[in-house]
Design a protein with these regions (language model features):
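Catalytic-core environment of secreted peptidases
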Residues: 1-56
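Short connector loops/turns at beta-strand edges and beta->alpha or beta->beta junctions
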Residues: 6-12, 89-93, 172-176
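Short beta-alpha connecting loops at secondary-structure transitions
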Residues: 20-21, 95-103, 176-188
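Soluble non-cytosolic domains of exported or imported proteins
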Residues: 25-33, 47, 62-66, 104-108, ...
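Extracytoplasmic/secreted envelope proteins and their assembly/folding machinery
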Residues: 32, 36-39, 50, 65-72, ...
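His/Asp/Glu-rich mid-to-C-terminal helical/loop segments that flank catalytic regions of hydrolases
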Residues: 33, 40, 44, 155-225
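Sec-exported extracytoplasmic/periplasmic mature domains
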Residues: 37-47, 73-77, 115, 119-123, ...
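Metal-dependent peptidase/peptidase-like ectodomains
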Residues: 58-167
Length: 226
């Protein structure tokens, strides 16, 4: 299985005003940090998962998923051995991690594993509050989906018309693809640690499943596996 996050953001600020570059702390420095920390913890663990796990940091997501598209098409391992993708992109650790939003949770058997892991961690699994955004196909997981590989992506949970939704809306208005997405913004670091622990457990659970993840018969995306 492959765990991904994108390294790139928007690059140099050419306006002559403000910071000289776009830091991209949430999009996607936080995702990269999660992948690195989970990789470190899993590499140090005495008990290894039954299935190998590749941690891959890709580039040019903001230019059209170019890095992940290349890797999904020409992986560093035999293509048939890539059976799942978990992608970290803009999880937004801005509030307590007591619920999780998982894009693609109803599309493959991996979603059932994710639900079980969330239950064990006392996390509520919330539905996508804005399905019209089509978030499941708007980050690097889509490159793997197009290659027929089941995938998931994650955010701190929130529901529409709540205080958390208002925070998310304000973040998008003020910081998304803006110079303000930098290290000066408030971050719930202790909650981010809990998020990483949940993901590490889920990765381990998926890697230890005797059967490889499969698209559900009801999933639109199953057509890419044929």
């Amino acid at each position: 299985m492959v765990v991904t996050a994108h390294l790139d953001h928007l690059g140099v600020n050419t306006t002559g005003q403000g910071a000289p570059y776009y830091a991209g702390a949430m999009d996607n420095g936080a995702g990269v940090a999660s992948v690195l920390e989970i990789a470190r913890e899993m590499a140090a663990a005495k008990v290894k998962p039954k299935r190998s796990v590749l941690f891959v940091l890709v580039t040019a997501e903001e230019k059209g998923l170019l890095g992940s598209k290349y890797f999904a098409g020409k992986p560093s391992v035999p293509p048939a051995s890539v059976v799942a993708n978990l992608n970290m992109d803009m999880a937004l650790p801005l509030w307590k991690f007591d619920s999780v939003l998982i894009y693609g949770i109803d599309e493959s058997t991996m979603g059932d594993t994710a639900k079980a892991a969330a239950k064990l961690a006392n996390l509520e699994v919330v539905a996508d509050p804005y399905p019209d955004r089509n978030s499941f196909i708007r980050s690097d997981q889509y490159s793997f989906i197009r290659a027929g590989i089941p995938a998931l992506s994650f955010k701190f949970g929130f529901k529409a018309d709540t205080d958390r939704a208002a925070i998310e809306k304000a973040w998008r208005a003020e910081r998304y693809h803006a110079l303000a997405d930098d290290l000066s913004q408030p971050v719930e670091k202790a909650e981010a640690v809990k998020f990483d622990a949940f993901l590490a457990q889920l990765i381990t659970d998926v890697a230890n499943e005797p059967a490889t993840p499969q698209w559900k018969d009801t999933s639109f995306f199953k057509r890419f596996a044929n």
